Curated annotation (Swiss-Prot):
Record's protein name: N-acetyl-gamma-glutamyl-phosphate reductase
Gene3D superfamilies named among the record's database cross-references: Dihydrodipicolinate Reductase, domain 2, NAD(P)-binding Rossmann-like Domain
Entries under CDD domains matching the protein: AGPR_1_C, AGPR_1_N
Gene: argC
Chief subcellular location: cytoplasm
Species in which this protein is naturally found: Parasynechococcus marenigrum (strain WH8102)
Reactions catalysed, as given in the entry: N-acetyl-L-glutamate 5-semialdehyde + phosphate + NADP(+) = N-acetyl-L-glutamyl 5-phosphate + NADPH + H(+)
Biological processes per GO annotation: L-arginine biosynthetic process
InterPro entries to which the protein is assigned, alphabetical: AGPR_AS, AGPR_type-1, NAD(P)-bd_dom_sf, NAGSA_dehydrogenase, Semialdehyde_DH_NAD-bd
Length: 357
């Protein structure tokens, strides 16, 4: 239904953070309308009894995620489900002609074998036989895969850490300006990145007034970042990635360290590289040399703010990126993909300016 009038969207996992953000973003969208709310724990309940803070017209009832019902109500489905669930529903939707944007990690890997290794806990309780579908899925980073997303039946939206890290990094890998070994990514995110299901580490008493690393070796997003980096660089890329939990609700800051192959390159040169790549992408803003992004600047927007500095003493390039982890890092990026699939400019209906402070 690309570009053909109002697009009907089903949001599955509607009461989780990703689902809530998707619904909120689509409330004011000129060309996409939410026509189906799906969920298992909330099935059968009126929306107002679950999320009274986000009123919806006619107070719809959340329904179970039945593929037949979804296909009758929607042209597109956004799956905001825990890992290991979307891969069970997506094939049924695709068979019925529903185009899918998956916010989980189920289809982010080209290889089902690699997904099974990285997401071993989920793989142990599933019997997946959809390796062909994994290969067909388009990695939903709109600034890099826009034309493919527009034609895709199944889009796998990237994780929040990969989004914030890849956007500043990929232009330099593409042009061969940095070494592909020794890349270090240091990232910080707020507590909403852990989802809406209660977790001990996300309790106020645990997270407040504290910063802590987690997943120090082998975090799941490491291999996801490496996969995309490898495809763009055309060679193997190995990097070190360490995330940190910081005491704020939303926002993500990624700092990437890489060694320049040409020690004569300046911060101005590197900024020009970023500007050339993202000049026509309104959801990415390249900051002037010496201006470094803050998460508050991106809060509640679908913008990624990127900046670069060069340490001439060490030959290191420092890339910085700030996003809202729930918008550009999740639901907003999903809507970007929906826009492309519906034949619209990717930024349609998405907030690009924050309220400050």
């Amino acid at each position: 239904m690309a570009g053909g009038g109002q697009g009907r969207v089903a949001v599955i996992g509607a009461s989780g953070y990703g689902g809530l953000q998707t619904i909120r973003l689509l409330q004011d969208h000129p060309s996409l309308t939410v026509t189906f709310l799906g969920g298992e724990r909330s099935a059968g309940r009126r929306w107002s009894s679950i999320c009274s803070f986000l009123p919806l017209p006619e107070d719809p009832v959340v329904q179970s995620a039945d593929a037949e019902r979804i296909a009758a109500a929607a042209d597109y489905a956004v799956l905001s489900l825990p890992n290991g669930l979307a891969c069970q529903l997506a094939p049924e939707l695709l068979q019925r002609g529903v185009r899918v944007v998956d916010l989980s990690a189920d289809f982010r890997y080209r290889s089902l074998e690699q997904w099974s290794q990285v997401y071993a806990q989920e793989a142990n309780r599933l019997s997946r036989e959809d390796s062909e579908l994994c290969q067909q899925a388009v990695y939903g980073l709109p600034e890099w895969h826009g034309p493919a997303i527009a034609e895709a039946r199944l889009v796998a939206a990237p994780g929040c850490f990969p989004t914030a890290s890849l956007l500043p990094l990929l232009p330099f890998l593409k042009q061969g300006l940095i070494d592909t070994d020794g890349i270090v990514i240091d990232a910080k995110t707020g507590t909403s990145g852990g989802g809406r299901v209660p977790k001990e580490a996300m309790l106020l008493a645990e997270a407040s007034e504290s910063i802590a690393p987690y997943g120090v070796i082998g975090h799941r997003h490491t291999s996801e970042i490496e996969q995309m980096a490898r495809e763009v660089a055309g060679q193997d890329v190995r990097l070190q990635f360490t995330p940190h939990l910081v005491p704020m609700v939303r926002g993500l800051l990624s700092t990437v360290y890489a060694r320049l192959r040409d020690p004569g390159l300046t911060a101005e040169d590197c900024t020009t590289v970023l500007e050339a790549v993202y000049r026509h992408h309104p959801c990415v803003s390249v900051l002037p040399v010496g201006t470094y992004p803050a998460t508050k600047w991106a809060r509640h927007t679908n913008r990624a703010l990127v900046s670069v500095q060069v340490d001439t003493r060490t030959g290191q390039m420092i890339l910085m990126s700030a996003i809202d982890n729930l918008i550009k890092g999740q639901a907003g990026q999903g809507v970007q993909c929906l826009n492309l699939m519906h034949g619209l400019p990717p930024e349609t209906g998405l907030p690009l300016q924050s309220f400050y402070p």
